[in-house]
Amino acid sequence: MQHEAHTHGINMSALGRDKQSLSLEQETVAIEVPGLSLYYGEKQALFDVSMNIPKQRVTAFIGPSGCGKSTLLRTFNRMNDLVDGCRVEGAINLYGNNIYRKGEDVAELRRRVGMVFQKPNPFPKTIYENVVYGLRIQGINKKRVLDEAVEWALKGAALWDEVKDRLHDSALGLSGGQQQRLVIARTIAVEPEVLLLDEPCSALDPISTLKVEELIYELKSKFTIVIVTHNMQQAARVSDYTAFMYMGKLVEFGDTDTLFTNPAKKQTEDYITGRYG
């Protein structure tokens, strides 16, 4: 059954997305989730979620508020460890290694798997010091190395041309959209393998949102990206693959064009056509 007529104006014009047909089975796996459940105390928030996140692609998580998409995202760098009473059952394998095994270096994991949150959170420091923050923590202090990293990361975050003449000004003087791109620069400066974006545009105006979306497309040549978004138009524009979640369960996961135009599950169709959520 075709559902093209029911996408309710969702713009499927991807940001330069490769037009060849995508297939999860043919992708290199970056993150393997072989049956994950998560509890906050007695309350179960994720129910036996299984999926493979492909390397150097953009994967979007969509679903109504409270469906578990941000909770799942935060398992990928163990941010949920910071929540009292949080308990995970199952494994998450990052390039074949279980990140929940005993003795895992969580600080190193969070360097390898960087995260950007909804609200831009630059530090009250200069633009330069924001970008090199993680490098300094690693003990890197040689000026030439830091200078090169700042230019590389700001260019990577499409911010260099806007700030190159004021690197020693406060980051708090930047616009919201610039601050979010600075946070992305700070995150990629330590050269992670995976970027987690938790509704990164929800606090931004449309023009800033477009810049961040274009940036996401550029960054996937270097990083595996997973984005949580409440905006289905955004998921359709920026992602290669989309996962639809509902009440802590993974309902459907596949290439974005197919999921939005010809979903396999009625629950998915009902959500993307606005019947609920």
UniProtKB/Swiss-Prot annotation:
CDD domains: ABC_PstB_phosphate_transporter (cd03260)
InterPro entries membership: AAA+_ATPase, ABC_transporter-like_ATP-bd, ABC_transporter-like_CS, P-loop_NTPase, PstB-like
Keyword terms, alphabetized: ATP-binding, Cell inner membrane, Cell membrane, Membrane, Nucleotide-binding, Phosphate transport, Translocase, Transport
Pfam families attached to this UniProt entry: ABC_tran
Catalytic activity: phosphate(out) + ATP + H2O = ADP + 2 phosphate(in) + H(+)
Subcellular location per the Swiss-Prot or TrEMBL entry: Cell inner membrane
Bilayer topology term: Peripheral membrane protein
Entry GO terms, CC: plasma membrane
Gene3D superfamilies: P-loop containing nucleotide triphosphate hydrolases
EC number(s) from the headed UniProt entry: 7.3.2.1
GO MF, any single term: ATPase-coupled phosphate ion transmembrane transporter activity
ABC transporter domain: residues covered: 31-272
Main location: membrane
GO biological process per UniProt: phosphate ion transmembrane transport
Residues that, per the record, bind ATP: 63-70
NCBIfam families: 3a0107s01c2
PANTHER family: ABC TRANSPORTER I FAMILY MEMBER 17 (PTHR43423), IRON EXPORT ATP-BINDING PROTEIN FETA-RELATED (PTHR43423:SF12)
Family, per entry: Belongs to the ABC transporter superfamily. Phosphate importer (TC 3.A.1.7) family.
Function (record text): Part of the ABC transporter complex PstSACB involved in phosphate import. Responsible for energy coupling to the transport system.
SUBUNIT field: The complex is composed of two ATP-binding proteins (PstB), two transmembrane proteins (PstC and PstA) and a solute-binding protein (PstS).
Protein name as annotated: Phosphate import ATP-binding protein PstB
Organism for this UniProt entry: Pseudomonas fluorescens (strain ATCC BAA-477 / NRRL B-23932 / Pf-5)
